[in-house]
Design a protein with these regions (language model features):
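Hydrophobic, well-ordered beta-alpha structural blocks that scaffold small-molecule cofactor pockets
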Residues: 212, 216-346
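Conserved S-adenosyl-L-methionine
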Residues: 195-206
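Short catalytic micro-motifs in class I SAM-dependent methyltransferases
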Residues: 132-134, 139
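Short, glycine-/aromatic-enriched active-site segment of Class I SAM-dependent methyltransferases
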Residues: 159-189
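A short glycine-rich, Lys/Arg-flanked "PGG" loop and its adjoining helix->strand segment in the class I
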Residues: 143-157
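Conserved N-terminal segment of class I S-adenosyl-L-methionine
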Residues: 1-124, 128, 132, 145, ...
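A short hydrophobic/small-residue beta-strand
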Residues: 158-159, 197
Length: 346
């Protein structure tokens, strides 16, 4: 697509890999099906991602007390459950490519329907259509968004949540993410879909972009800030991120060369670093208590407060800016933290 987006090469080999991944995929495997939590970077207080997002969007979205919502790619129903909790008078619908979680979703309070198949074929129109970590899986995101615009009521809103690859280079490592978004690219994709950007934030959920879009009949200020966005800029951006990932891997190997290390995190970045270091990993450390119940990559998962977590130096598998915040917040645990390399200056 002509929007200077970073995308995977959409080859037959890539599609075969993706088909294999989706056949074997288990949602939120490490936490036993529980949605990942979001931690307050200052206090460490944890809350579910969906509930956190909806609470932070209360004022920007200004939703009515009642309405209809369509959650596209609803997974096992985390966002639907949070919506039913905060807005009990709303009628909720979910869609998925298959009916693996049909029973769980249909049992949620407020859910009136669950559909499989193409999202744009879902009957009816809605006051809110949500795409939470869906758009990055779509090879042609503008076309996909345009197909969903017909599902919006005239005053309806489309809510999008995607990874921010500029703030989180680890997003580039995820095989089934076909499109990698920056704020400028997401804004352009929304406009190419014939929609207007009502909201675009990168601070509501760490490492993620949050956008709200509406039909163009609504009067909103136009922010034409895309004149400098070019394929050359995108290539330079992604090259810098890949070089950073390589430096991180090299530094981590050096730390683990003589003595095993701990790895903070059991999500994508932790998985990548664990695979990079192999037997150089002694254990993983994670603040999410739901991830302590089972080993990860054959190694125990410890809480930062566990005495055993102090036995080795622990590498923070996070972007540098977030790793510094976490290390500061957890400095009283007694763990010797190893920060990732600082990013190259632009």
């Amino acid at each position: 697509m002509q929007c200077a987006a970073v995308q995977k090469p959409l080859t037959n080999q890539w599609q075969t890999l993706i088909d294999t991944i989706y056949r074997q995929y288990q949602i939120y495997h490490q936490s036993g099906g529980k949605e990942q939590v979001v931690f307050n970077t200052q206090t460490g207080q944890a809350a579910g991602r969906s509930l956190t997002l909806l609470r932070k969007l209360t004022e920007p979205l200004a939703l009515s007390a009642s309405g209809r919502m369509l959650d596209v790619g609803c997974g096992n129903g985390a966002l639907l459950a949070a919506m039913g909790n905060l807005y009990p008078q709303w009628r909720l619908t979910g869609t998925e490519p298959n009916d693996q979680h049909r029973q769980a979703i249909e049992s949620l309070p407020g859910v009136e329907a669950f559909h499989t198949g193409e999202a744009h074929q879902t009957p009816g129109q809605f006051d809110l259509v949500t795409l939470i970590h869906v758009l990055e899986h779509i090879p042609h995101p503008a076309v996909f968004l345009r197909s969903l615009s017909a599902k919006l009521q005239p005053a309806g809103q489309l809510l999008i949540e995607v990874p921010d690859h500029q703030r989180n280079p680890f997003d580039l490592l995820i095989a089934d993410h076909s499109t990698h978004f920056s704020p400028a690219v997401l804004r352009r994709v929304i406009r190419q879909a014939g929609l207007q950007v009502k909201l675009l934030e990168r601070t509501l959920i760490p490492k993620e972009l949050t956008a709200a879009a509406v039909l163009p009949v609504q009067s909103l200020p136009h922010h034409d800030d895309l004149t400098s966005l070019s394929p050359a800029d995108a290539l330079q951006d992604v090259t810098r991120h890949i070089n950073w990932l390589r430096r991180f891997a090299d530094e981590a190997r050096a730390h683990a060369r003589h003595d095993p290390v701990g790895v903070f995190g059991t999500s994508i970045a932790g998985t990548w670093l664990g695979a990079t270091l192999g037997d150089g990993v002694a254990y993983f450390v994670d603040e999410d208590t739901s991830r302590h119940e089972r080993p990860f990559m054959g190694k125990p998962v410890l809480a930062p407060t566990d005495r055993a977590a102090r036995q080795a130096k622990v590498i923070l598998a996070l972007p540098h800016w977030l790793a510094t915040q976490v290390a500061t917040r957890l400095q009283d645990t007694g763990i010797e933290w190893i920060l990732p390399p600082a990013p190259e200056s632009v």
